[in-house]
């Protein structure tokens, strides 16, 4: 970046990085806090994330993609929770979506981008909001659709129109 170039930084995996930091911090005498993670783990991950992003005028940018390993799809797990609080957004990959054969298996309803509303036009943001609403409605009624319990009605016309 200091040479004025744009950089793509791929980090696999921030979970293993946090676990390694936990081990060294505990060996150094730090006391565990968040599910055995010392408080310095949040600081170290935040420092790593802050080094990426836009550079100063005339310098390059660093776009970062961090992978987070989540045991049993538990998004409340300490490292996943830390990352969600630090980064500008996250893309959740879903095993269930992959099993249905949809790739990339991105769970659109659980994924978040804090910068997208500023990057899209007002019309695009309306389309995105409407698409997410329709997808949420479909996800809500999909068990009834699979069980063939779907009936006609004003709400169901919205579903079939999606």
Where are these regions (language model features)?
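P-loop NTPase catalytic core
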Residues: 1-162
